[in-house]
């Protein structure tokens, strides 16, 4: 398994909710979590768990949704992780 954490300095909106709804249908995506900071509503995080690094790379290289997110949320960053253990 492979994971990445997407972080943006942006509050939740109808647009971000729609992005997440579209994202959940991505092939190869096993789990996705949308988080918002309790103390800072602009602290937005999405955690994506993929079946493989290749599945995540396919999404990152070719998805129109990724381009839409990057344009709408210019502060977005993605950090990549290998999943070592899970429950």
Where do the language-model regions lie?
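Cell wall/extracellular polymer interaction/catalysis modules
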Residues: 65
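Short S/T/G/P-rich N-terminal loop/turn motif that feeds into the first structured element of a domain
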Residues: 1-61, 71-87
């Amino acid at each position: 398994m492979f994971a990445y954490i997407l972080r943006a300095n942006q509050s939740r909106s109808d647009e971000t909710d729609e992005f997440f709804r579209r994202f959940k249908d991505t092939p190869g995506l096993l789990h996705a979590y949308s988080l918002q900071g309790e103390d800072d509503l602009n602290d937005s995080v999405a955690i994506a768990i993929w079946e493989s690094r290749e599945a995540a790379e396919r999404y990152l290289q070719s998805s129109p949704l990724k381009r839409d997110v990057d344009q709408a949320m210019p502060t977005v960053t993605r950090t990549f992780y290998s999943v070592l253990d899970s429950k």
